[in-house]
Amino acid sequence: MNSIYAFANQNIIRVQLTDVKAPYTINIKGPYKAYNYKYESEIISALTNETVMVVENRLGLKVNEVGVYKEGIVFETQDGFTLNGIEYYGSLMFIPYNDTMIVVNELNIEDYVKGVLPHEMSPDWPMEALKAQAVAARTYAMYHILKNANKLPFDVDNTTKYQVYNGKEKMNWSVEQAVDRTRYEIAVYKGKVIATYFSALCGGHTDSAENVFGVAVPYLGGVACPYCNAQIKPWTNALSYNELNNDLANYSVHATEKSSIGISTDPKSGKATNIKIDNNDITSRDFRTTLSPRLVPSLNFTIKKVDNGIIITGKGSGHGVGMCQWGAYGMAQVKKDYKEILKFYYNGVDIVDYNRVNKEFEPDVWGN
C-alpha cells in the first residue's frame, strides 16, 4: 500500500489506548471472533455475550488461561466491547510493537469523533460550536490516518498528543447530534486534508504555525479573534533565577539580577517569538515547553525582572494555532454557523463530504 490509504479504508481509524494496562477484562456484546494478529488464524468464535480474560506474560498473551499468543490477538466484534470497565465501539487489537504489546481500538471514524468530542469541548456548549469541533476532530483524525498509513500499527493515540479519546464515556445527545449533523464532513485546503489544530483560548489573536511550529502554513496564519474576549483572564507565574537557570540549563542560561532579558514579538499577533537572556536566544515555543505549559500557558506573555527572579504575565491558554475553542463558543453565541466558524479560523479551506467525493485524499504534510 502506498502512502495514500485506499478510499474504502479512509473511514477506519486505529487508536492506541495508552492508559489501558494488563490484566485485561473484556466484555463483548453479541457475536465476535478472536484470531491471531499475525497469522489471522481463528482462536475463538462465539455467538453470544461473553467475558474474556487476557493476561500478559513474558511469552505473550493468554486468553481465558488458554494458549500463549506472542503474535498478538484481534477481537473482531459487531456491537463493541467493554475493556477494563470502559465501553468502546469497534474491535480490539493486541499488537506486538517495539518489544511490548500495545492495545489498539479499531473503529469507524464517526464513532471515534463521538468519543473525542466530549473530552475536547463541553457537551453543554452551543450546537454550532460542537459541530465545528466535530469537523475539526474528524479532519484531524483523517489527516493522521492518511499520514501514518502503513507506517505504524496505529494512527493516533488517546492522549493530548493527538486528541483525547475514552470510548463512549461522556456520550450524550448533544455529542451524537453534533457528529451526526456533520457526518463525513472534513476541511481541505486545495483538495488536501489539513491538520486542524485547535486550542482552548487564543487570548485575542490566534497564532501562526510559523511562530509555533516553525513552518508557514497558509490556512494557519493567525487571525484577530474578538469572540473570546469575555473569557480572557490574565495569568501570572514567578520563577527564581535558580529555577530559571535549572530549567534552561540546556541553553547555557545563567541569569542573575544583572542579566538582560528581552522578548521579540510577532507584529501581527503580539505573541512572543523569541526570548533573549544575555547572549542566549531561545524561541518562545522552546521557552514555553521547557518551562512547561503550566507555568507558561500560552505564547501571549511578557517577562518582568524582579530582585530574585522573573514574573511571567500573559493571557490565553494553549498553543494558540487554528481554532480558538472559546472563540468558537463566542461565534456560536452570535449566530455564526459551524462552517463560518471553521472558515474564520482556517483561512481558505473548503468543507467537503469525504463520502461523496470519489477520490483518494492526501494529507497536507508540512513537516509537523
Swiss-Prot record:
InterPro entries: Bact_Sporulation_Assoc, SpoIID/LytB, SpoIID/LytB_N. Has shown promise in a 4-component vaccine with BHWA1_00430 (AC C0QY54), SecA (AC C0QZS7) and FlaAL (AC C0QWY9). GO terms for biological process: sporulation resulting in formation of a cellular spore. It holds the Pfam family SpoIID. GO terms for cellular component: outer membrane-bounded periplasmic space. Might be involved in sporulation. This is Uncharacterized protein BHWA1_00569.
